[in-house]
From Swiss-Prot:
Homodimer. The capsid proteins form dimers that assemble by group of 5. Twelve such pentamers are linked together with free dimers. The homodimers binds to the viral RNA via an operator hairpin, but also to many other RNA sequences in the viral genome; this interaction probably shifts the virus from the replicative to the assembly phase and ensures specific encapsidation of the viral genome. This is Capsid protein. Keywords: Capsid protein, RNA-binding, T=3 icosahedral capsid protein, Translation regulation, Virion. InterPro entries: Levivir_coat (IPR002703), Phage_RNA-type_capsid (IPR015954). It comes from Enterobacteria phage ZR (Bacteriophage ZR).
Length: 130
């Protein structure tokens, strides 16, 4: 099986403001991707897979999205992150799930966050579900 620890486009903004993250670390079973921005302004993704029980495998996915800003210190403009938003997702899959079962789970995840659906619409509008 080919490695899936490769760079990918995290934010697809029609090519003009795309954010690509590249592999940066893989230690203790945790894969980390980071954007090329300065460390304080970088987008970061981590993913780990653990055996959560004899019957289940647990994926833990975390995404950090920075609010990019600058700060002037001593007449020098420095890049900083004004704040960060964090996404944490846990996915538990029975070890006896087939590849087609897992493909269906991925399709459900993609549908969950598809543009125009209620959850991403609420997040994009900084509002609730109503």
């Amino acid at each position: 099986m080919a490695s899936n620890f490769t760079q990918f486009v995290l934010v697809n903004d029609g090519g003009t403001g795309n954010v690509t993250v590249a592999p940066s670390n893989f230690a203790n079973g945790v894969a980390e991707w980071i954007s090329s921005n300065s460390r304080s302004q970088a987008y970061k993704v981590t993913c780990s897979v653990r055996q959560s029980s004899a019957q289940n495998r647990k994926y833990t996915i975390k995404v950090e999205v920075p609010k990019v800003a600058t700060q002037t210190v001593g007449g020098v403009e420095l890049p900083v992150a004004a704040w960060r938003s964090y996404l944490n997702m846990e996915l538990t899959i029975p070890i006896f799930a087939t590849n087609s079962d897992c493909e269906l789970i991925v399709k459900a995840m993609q549908g969950l966050l598809k543009d125009g659906n209620p959850i991403p619409s609420a997040i994009a509008a900084n509002s609730g579900i109503y």
